[in-house]
Every structure is written in C-alpha cells, then in structure tokens.
Amino acid sequence: MNPPAIDKVPDVTFVVAAYNSADTIVRAIESALAQEGVTVEVVVVDDCSADATPALVAAIPDPRVRLIALDRNRGPGGARNAGIGAARGRWIAVLDSDDTVRPDRLRRMIERADAAGAQIAVDNLDVVSLDGRSLRMFSEAELARLPQLTLPAFIESNVLFRSEHNFGYMKPIFERRFLENQQLRFDEALRIGEDYILLASALACGGRCAVEPSAGYIYHIREGSISRVLRLDHIDAMIAADEAFLRRYALDGLAQKMQHRRMRGFREARSFLVLVEQLKKRSLAGALKTALADPFALRHLSMPIAARLRRLAARFVHPSSHSAPRAAPVTAAAERSPLGNDPRISKG
C-alpha cells in the first residue's frame, strides 16, 4: 500500500473500485490526478482482481495514490465502502475504473456546492460509445434550470421504463463529514441500484444537492463491461432496498407520490419478467394468469425485448416449427441505457 502523500487533508478523495480493470485503471487514475484547482488523493480498492490491476496501481509512483486490496470480493458497493472508510478528503468522488473525469470537474462542482451551501453535488456527463461517439446526456440549458436536485425529482426520474434519461446516471460527490454524520454507505446487497439508494438516502436525510450543468464526467462504454441485465432477483433486491428506505425515512407528500410510481414500475417489471419466463416455458395458463393480474405489464412491449417476446409467443403457438426457446433477459433499457434503449451499448 502506498503511504499518503501529505498530512494536509486533500479537497477530494477519489474512490475507485476496481475489478479486472487492467486495461482502463491507469487512464482513470491519471484523469483524477489531473484535477486543476483542487488537491486530491486517489484510493483504489481492488476487489480481488485476477488480472494485473493491483500491480499496475502499485506501480504508479505518485504518492497521492493508495491501493487497498480486499481479501474477498465484496462487489462494487462493498469496495466503494472500503474506499470511503479510508478517505481523508473533504469531499468524496466515486470514479468507475473504466471512466474518466475532465480536469476542471471537481473545482466546478465544489464551487457550485459551496455557493449553495450544499453537501452533495452532481453534474452532467458525456457518454462515449463503443464506436467512439460522444453524446451529452442532458442539455446544459435543462440542468441550468435545475439549480438543486430534490428528492421528489430524483425519485421520479428513476421510475422504470421511463423514456427519458434518469438522474441515477449522474455521479454525485458527497461531503465526507455529511456521510459520516448521517452514517451513509452503499448497500452491499445491491448489484444494480446501489448508487440510487445512496443518493436518495442522502437527500431524504436533509442533504442539499447542487447541480453543475457542465459535463465533467466521461462515461465510457466498452466491450466486457458488466452486462446490464435485469433479472427477477435484481427486481426483488431493489424492492427490498426501497422498502427499507421507506422504513428509515419519512417522505413528504410529493416524494411519496413519486415513490409510489417507482414501486408500481417495479411491480410491472416483475410481472413482465414472470410473463417472459412463462412464455419461455410455454405455460399458457401461467402467462394468461400473469397478464390478467397485471395487464399494465403488457404495455412494455415497445422495449427491445418485445421482438424476442413475440418470437417466444410464436414458438408457444407453433412449437413444432422451432427449437426450444433460449433465455431472453430484459436489459437495463428498463432503467434507460445511457445512449438510449439499445442493450448492445449499455454498461454496468
């Protein structure tokens, strides 16, 4: 483990959870170290990689970089929690091991947060696809009209099957003291949606979130990224996390209304996934029962999975003309892929 560079508390600690990230980890770290106008440290938490990731990090000569090697795989939430526990900075910024940040990102965000008296800040982001295209996720004019991100707006944007990009893709920074005082950490039981629960919890316990309209975070989609496949166990885990969130925090009327929409989206998604499984098994009675119990689940046939679902239905009707159906997972288009409803370009 590299020792801390200096005794002075840095402005920002970048927390980078890394798992088999040898091809991108150095690029991510270098972008963090290149921040202008703020002092930084980078805490890389290796989550039991089987490649050269820890060796590459350990070889970086900059004393601002620290490596923590976990003795067991804890997933992204657990690795980030280990990094937060080791952080020394006033602010904590999570950086994915295959992404990068622009040099002025943290200066802009901290200035925005300090001016608003905020404990949290989010900004815009650019998404770079496999073919090198770069698209801005939100219009700067749209975000300029949103000086602060509120809990109702955040929940509403994270309703499954919405056609708009959701604020859940933003990468917030948090005041470390605020996280400590509120005892906030990532939910290690979640593999999809852990970012959402942390920011929602921070807003629910009174955190103020400033919005920086410029794009300082660069979200890279690459081959080999964790596939964004939405499964029944993911839905059940997110429902359980939301139920725990509701038990912990008292929401105002508007936030409750948005939360009701979000839970309804989960129920529809669950019914839809059950329907797909029943069609795959050629269980007409089960499929009809599910459709009758939750007819709203059928309206999502415009999703990319629709073509697969129709093929499954055709195989059910004409089983002799087709081989056994293959699994047809619902992709994270349900939560809106960063470049649109295309499962080929979504990343974990």
Swiss-Prot record:
GO terms for cellular component: cytoplasm. Disulfide bonds: none annotated. Belongs to the glycosyltransferase 2 family. It is found in: Cytoplasm. It comes from the Bacteria. Keywords: Cytoplasm, Exopolysaccharide synthesis, Glycosyltransferase, Plasmid, Transferase. Pathway: Glycan metabolism; exopolysaccharide biosynthesis. This is Succinoglycan biosynthesis protein ExoO. It is an enzyme of class 2 (transferase). One of its GO terms (biological process) is polysaccharide biosynthetic process. Residues 324-334 have a biased composition (Low complexity). Glycosyltransferase required for the synthesis of succinoglycan (EPS I). Needed for the addition of the fifth sugar (glucose), catalyzes the formation of a beta-1,6 linkage between the fourth and fifth sugar. The gene is exoO. It comes from Rhizobium meliloti (strain 1021) (Ensifer meliloti). One of its GO terms (molecular function) is glycosyltransferase activity.
